[in-house]
Amino acid sequence: MYYYVNKMKKIIPVILLVLSLAGCYNSSEPRERILKIYNWADYIGDSVLEDFQAYYKEQTGENIRIVYQTFDINEIMLTKIEKGHEDFDVVCPSEYIIERMLKKHLLLPIDTNFAHSPNYMQNVAPFIREQINKLSQPGEEASRYAVCYMWGTAGILYNRAYIPDSVATSWECLWNRKYAGKILMKDSYRDAYGTAIIYAHAKELEEGTVTVEELMNDYSPRAMELAEKYLKELKPNIAGWEADFGKEMMTKNKAWLNMTW
């Protein structure tokens, strides 16, 4: 039996946004008849993409082709976009990448005049709006460039056959030498750093003298050194750094703990 415990009490929105890239495109098709999407795997089913093309034809009388690509690491996605190899219309990164993209002027404002969804923007939860606008840059309100698609938390998935419930109540279980070679971590700088720095400040968090948000955004030399120290201590326990194969390893008992989304 597997069980999931929410650990990182931080909202991590996943956002849709429009890009201002002018990458190369070698095709005889008119570019305006192609919708290019860059997304995480498993976020949109193939049938939805097919249905959208039919819906678009029904609404406009025009055909559209969807070019759909996926990524599994935020930084790989950002690097590809920065190099200008693709002119994506829509991408779906995590929130901290949106902040970087705004700083580098990689985005275009979203046309919020949704003809068939007039109430969408007005009905976005105020909390989500607030989280998005925390990413704003001078003169650039983030909600002009990003619309929330999903949000979630990071936590621990564990196999009850090997891990007692009482053990999986703290990040400390990841550093337990009993589970050497049986722990999976996300192949994500942000999540690896966050896990280490939160664990390092467990006492301060419990006392309420610091918040998770403050820790996640602390990139001082002292914080970086501390995170590095704890990640090096964690290394013997790691079975792998994964983005999408964690569930398979867990079901085959090759890993017992998975720091996951």
Where are these predicted regions, by residue range?
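Short, low-complexity disordered leader/linker segments with a strong preference
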Residues: 1-34
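Short N-terminal micro-motifs specific to bacterial/archaeal maturation
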Residues: 15, 68, 164-165, 256
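Short, well-ordered beta-to-alpha junction loops that form the rim of enzyme active sites
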Residues: 40, 95, 188-189, 260-261
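Extracytoplasmic ligand-binding site segments that recognize negatively charged/polar headgroups
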Residues: 43-46, 102-249, 254
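Short, glycine/acidic-rich beta->alpha junctions
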Residues: 72-73, 166, 260
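Paired acidic/hydrophobic, glycine-rich loop segments that form the ligand-binding mouth/hinge
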Residues: 88-93, 239-240, 256-261
